[in-house]
UniProtKB/Swiss-Prot annotation:
Keywords: 2Fe-2S, Amino-acid biosynthesis, Branched-chain amino acid biosynthesis, Iron, Iron-sulfur, Lyase, Magnesium, Metal-binding. The lineage of its organism: Bacteria, Pseudomonadati, Pseudomonadota, Gammaproteobacteria, Pseudomonadales. The gene is ilvD. The modification N6-carboxylysine is found at residue 124. Pathway: Amino-acid biosynthesis; L-isoleucine biosynthesis; L-isoleucine from 2-oxobutanoate: step 3/4; Amino-acid biosynthesis; L-valine biosynthesis; L-valine from pyruvate: step 3/4. This is Dihydroxy-acid dehydratase. Its cofactor is [2Fe-2S] cluster; Mg(2+).
């Protein structure tokens, strides 16, 4: 039976000094016999998805202590991708994921904590904490801050989100007054942005991985029901500790819950709900931390057989996360997938012995439990606020229409092919990814002329200056993990293409990545990246490129001899951008770039290189 890790610093005569310091934090004699639960919070006033988390750590802490544990809270950083977008701040977003993972590891290992409650929400925070949890492999539960309510305005017939504000701002025909109205209405409350963007996608995936409670990805940040998730997380983590440390049950450890089959479940959910392409990057990174052989080949295999059962902004304007919740949340999507024979349901979760048990209890089409139905009726109040649990509005009815509703059955899927796809070809030998959920079917096969830009900044200038025409394939390169460095998101270029009326007439290919708010024929994560000798660095203005989503291919239409000749020439020149890029690459960013792998590896650190440098 494993000992509490915390005994290292709480037991024995030689630890008198450590105990003296623990006592200074408020611990008493009886506390040294209890598990120490680390509460990894991510409160910050910089990020709307985290602005309401200040008191959440202590809310969980009180419940941990009632359940028989000792709670110790600490904070990690959180970067807002939307605020960092469109300038050098975006260079820091993806690297922050590694910093977050490391900071959780540092705090938990330095203080010998026995378990973790991860209070996350936005884009890099959930992935960073997930990486740390799988690295540490001690009992863990995730509870996120929850999604923002969709914005409302009389100027639009649909709910608004951040992307609407960006698109209208780039529309030269829109008045300043209309832009201001959208700006003031798009993000009305605390919480992660209201569509199926990266933050909400990742919080939904923690449910599928088995590491979070039902409702974690969909219950609104403002709704009073969400408080129960935090309280239940506090009780559950102490129970998980008891099972592992007192009953020798290692099935509750994160690597045994989030195993290979669970990663397949998470990716299956992601494809079915048309999640952000960033989720692929983060799942690949988390799998490496768990030492699981899960890669783009597995994702490609799943993408060919999983239908799209849910369509949410930015893929469709009609639905936001509040609508997903009303339709039964993630466990209702999982229920439909299970009935289609597309899930592994025999896996443990933090709340049920098996996923099948969890689905039976929480899928609104399977259960008559009035409490479950009431929970999923929780809806938006439409009142701007930065306060959690500030309203208790409920829909009069659930959306259980699986033929035409927000969530569909396999038989009535939005499409029989899912919302994400992996493409391979001579321009991306190790793969690239596209969110097919946001691509109009008329351009699933697209041949166009390459228009080369060697930074996001120059691409934005070119698009706004009307240098990009219908039929072009915009190539933005040297923006990968090494080349950027930091693998910037390309939300501004895609939003501006849309505002110019080119959303269905152009494509975009990059070794960078896309915001979860991106839609259109936007292909990212081209691997290897240009800075690592990837063929995207060999494309020239005017070259023809053929994109074929049904056949999962993307190719530069030149022969092998020409490709080899260009590669020899580029090897001599060096793999770096020709155009001047006035960006400041700090020591911190250089350190990230030195060790970063391409996107097909999750843009994690190159462990082989690390082992060489530090044997």
């Amino acid at each position: 039976m494993p000992d509490y890790r915390s005994k290292t610093s709480t037991h024995g005569r030689n630890m008198a000094g450590a105990r003296a310091l623990w006592r200074a934090t408020g611990m008493k004699d009886e506390d040294f016999k209890k598990p120490i639960i680390a509460i990894a919070n991510s409160f910050t006033q910089f990020v709307p998805g985290h602005v309401h988390l200040k008191d959440m750590g202590q809310l969980v802490a009180r419940e941990v202590e009632r359940a028989g544990g000792v709670a110790k809270e600490f904070n990690t950083i959180a970067v807002d991708d939307g605020i960092a977008m469109g300038h050098d701040g975006m260079l820091y977003s993806l690297p922050s994921r590694e910093i977050i993972a490391d900071s959780v590891e540092y705090m938990v290992n330095a203080h010998c904590a026995d378990a973790i409650v991860c209070i996350s929400n936005c884009d890099k925070i959930t992935p960073g904490m997930l990486m740390a949890s799988l690295r540490l492999n001690i009992p863990v539960i995730f509870v996120s801050g929850g999604p923002m309510e969709a914005g409302k305005t009389k100027l639009a017939s649909h709910g608004l989100d951040l992307v609407d504000a960006m698109v209208i701002a780039a529309d030269s025909t829109a008045s300043d007054e209309k832009v201001a109205e959208y700006e003031r209405s798009a993000c009305p409350t605390c919480g992660s942005c209201s569509g199926m963007f990266t933050a909400n996608s990742m919080n939904c995936l923690t449910e599928a991985l088995g590491l979070a409670l039902p409702g974690n990805g969909s219950a609104l940040a403002t709704h009073s029901d969400r408080e129960q998730l935090f309280l239940q997380a506090g009780r559950t983590i102490v129970d998980l500790c008891r099972q592992y440390y007192k009953e020798n049950d290692d099935s509750v450890l994160p690597r045994n819950i989030a195993n290979f089959k669970a990663f397949e479940n998470a990716m299956t959910l992601d494809i079915a709900m048309g999640g952000s392409t960033n989720t692929i990057l983060h799942l690949l990174a988390a799998a490496q931390e768990a030492e699981i052989d899960f890669d783009l080949r597995h994702i490609d295999h799943l993408s060919r057989k999983v239908p799209q059962l849910c369509k949410v902004a930015p893929n469709i304007q009609k639905y936001h996360m509040e609508d997903v919740h009303r339709a039964g949340g993630i466990f209702s999507i999982l229920g439909e997938l299970a009935r289609g024979g597309l899930l592994h349901t025999d896996l443990p979760t933090v709340h049920s012995k098996t996923l099948a048990e969890g689905i039976a209890k929480w899928d609104i089409t399977q259960t008559d439990d009035e409490a479950v139905h009431t929970f999923f009726k929780a809806g938006p109040a439409g009142i701007p606020t930065q306060t959690a649990f500030s309203q208790s509005t409920r829909w009069e009815s659930l959306d259980d229409d699986r033929e035409n509703g927000c969530i569909r059955s396999v038989q009535h899927a939005y499409s029989q092919e899912g919302g994400l796809a992996v493409l391979y070809g001579n321009i991306a030998l190790d793969g690239c990814v596209v969110k097919t959920a946001g691509v109009d079917e008329s351009i699933h096969v697209f041949e166009g002329s390459a228009k080369i830009f060697e930074s996001q900044d120059s691409a934005v200038r070119g698009i706004l200056a009307d240098e990009v025409k219908a039929g072009d394939i915009v190539i933005i390169r040297y923006e990968g993990p090494k080349g950027g460095p930091g693998m910037q998101e390309m939300l501004y270029p895609t939003s501006y293409l849309k505002s110019k009326g080119l959303g269905k007439d152009c494509a975009l290919l990059t070794d960078g990545r896309f915001s979860g708010g991106t839609s259109g024929l936007s292909i990212g994560h081209a691997s290897p990246e240009a800075a690592a000798g990837g063929a995207i660095g060999l494309v020239r203005d005017g070259d023809k490129v053929l994109i074929d989503i049904p056949n999962r291919s993307i190719n530069l239409l030149i022969d092998d001899a020409e490709m080899a000749e260009r590669r020899t020439e580029q090897d001599k020149k060096g793999w770096k951008p020709v155009e001047s890029r006035p960006r400041k690459v700090t020591t911190a960013l250089k350190a990230y770039a030195l060790l970063a792998t391409s996107a097909d590896k999750g843009a994690v650190r190159d462990k082989a290189l690390l082992d060489k440098l530090v044997p």
